[in-house]
Amino acid sequence: MAMTTTASGLSYEDTRAGTGASPQQGQTCVMHYTGWLWENGAKGAKFDSSLDRGKPFNFPLGQGRVIKGWDEGVASMQIGGQRTLLIPPKLGYGERGAGGVIPPNATLLFEVELLEVR
């Protein structure tokens, strides 16, 4: 992967450029996503996917409703775009992990698609 790494430590790569507007703080982002654990430099176990449920996920951008890596990684996307996010623990679930599915200090890999902004 030819990823761009930001000052915070988030890495991302656009797999399909969007053509619509980028979301603004407070707007609702409607997404499809799949998340995997990143283990030993490779995609590990899948832990969640909106595609598997057949229902997009939505959240207000920049309001702390999702992990920091999502708020940062989605902010510069455009509607219709697809992006791979590689999220270090400090921008993910950190030392606490999540729900017995994501271990403490896990690096996460997400494939996300910005479907709509409202």
Annotate the PLM regions.
Residues 1-118:
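Cross-family detector of peptidyl-prolyl cis-trans isomerase
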